[in-house]
Amino acid sequence: GLEETYCSMRIKENI
């Protein structure tokens, strides 16, 4: 849910 979206956003920013 919310955690999955947050993790995805973090990974995208890292790249």
From Swiss-Prot:
Coiled-coil blocks: none
Keyword Chaperone on entry: no
Gene Ontology molecular-function annotations: nutrient reservoir activity
Cleaved signal peptide residues: none
Keywords of this entry: Disulfide bond, Seed storage protein, Storage protein
Subunit: Hexamer; each subunit is composed of an acidic and a basic chain derived from a single precursor and linked by a disulfide bond.
Family: Belongs to the 11S seed storage protein (globulins) family.
Biological role stated in the UniProt entry: Seed storage protein.
Protein's name in the database: Globulin 2
